[in-house]
Amino acid sequence: TLYEMADAKPEEYKYLAKALAHFAADIHLHEILHKDFTPGNILWKQDEEGFHFMLVDINRMDFGPVSEKKGLYNLRRFWGPKEFTRILVSEYALLRNRDTDKAVAYVMKERARFWTQYGKKHEIPFQLEL
């Protein structure tokens, strides 16, 4: 899963974040929305052909058009370095023809809101950079 990226450095996750953005944009353009799109539900591997992703917990999916805004909102639950999320969202926004600065600002705001609310009800067992 993507859990191992929680403490990684930018040079370790930069290409992974961009590849994940391509994967997310691709499934969204194919009208697939995983409602629990989080690091624990995304399996990945890298080989000579690049990065490969697979989703688990697939009983929580919607099928139908995924707007750019809905797709961006779907990226709010990533933890770990903010830079990972910034790279992911910037690349996703480019692929969906959105303004990258506005997309990053929107997702970071929603990310902070999500984790603040989550932290009121649950213990967060890792360092969270908001």
PLM ranges: what are they?
Residues 51-127:
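C-lobe/activation-segment region of protein kinase-like
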Residues 6, 36, 46, 62-64:
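Activation segment
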Residues 1-15:
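Conserved structural core of kinase catalytic domains
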Residues 41-55:
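Conserved protein kinase catalytic/activation segment
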Residues 23-32:
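Protein kinase catalytic-loop region centered on the HRD/HxD motif
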Residues 32-39:
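Catalytic-loop of the protein kinase fold
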